[in-house]
């Protein structure tokens, strides 16, 4: 009833807003007075006082003018879409995730004013299933999203065209999902020891490291219809590749080997050089690498079987424990070094520098913010299952893989459910 009442109020406000536009047009031939640069803009109120992404808000005040090219509205640092202005009212759309408590600022020309009262942003988190049938016995069916079936879905990545790539590690396959085309396709089968797929910085080529003697990378390129091609870094000898990550600044692919060596490779020429040695040589074959999206000098390595995450600084060679405790599994949110994980697997960063972790044996997705606080995004710690919905309801069964696209949508390889899930945080 409360939600219905709010919708009714907002609808009434919108009708009032449009009526004001119409009345003003009938009286003066324009939709409001133009902005007067010799007078200050004034803010009086806004409504509603809280909401989530795409909430429609009306800002009341004076001297806004009607030229939308001169009007900007910000929720903290995030710019809102301005739909209409009649000089005394501005109609805006709330942007995605501007922060929990938002200062609304209006800029008109060179004039600027901010409300003292803050807008309370309500984050909405939901998970849905893109494709796959939970716990199916059939594990290799291509076709539509509804018809497709998978083996154990271990790792995932996504390109700029929103193609989703899924490594079925124990079934030795790489699959491609295209939501827009409603299609799942197998790109390669009988792959020896495939690990975590990654997309290079141009958002096109996909590289798949192989954990084999001598090491290998498989390359999949849309310009060759995703045909599989075997490539090796030149001038560097690595053994048993276990993970690769692209650096957002130098655009090079960094490859970690089981023997602890770290090399960097030009994805075009394949020229490579050794970066360092001794990064926990032979410690574990499940080491998943990812660069910080805001600080490309920092490479993070998640050691699944050791239940912790390390950080390697390229410029100094400093290598330290970043989150969790070595060989101490468990579940605890809080400060990163006090937090506990249980077989954390794939990690990724969104464009805001938030790290997401597929905490597989805790059956949930965790995050680490820029202040180092660990929290549970979705899933019930210690409880396996399959349920779509909100954080209070959603269940996973050992999710190993997580990836995020440029819009902040998170893709989850829900391993034992044999599904690919989508997490929307708005």
Residue ranges and their predicted role:
Residues 22-129, 159-165, 175:
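Ser/Thr/Pro-rich low-complexity tracts
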Residues 17-20:
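C-terminal motif of bacterial Sec signal peptides marking the signal peptidase cleavage site
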Residues 172-176, 215-219, 260-264, 307-311, ...:
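A short loop-to-beta-strand structural motif that recurs across blades of beta-propeller domains
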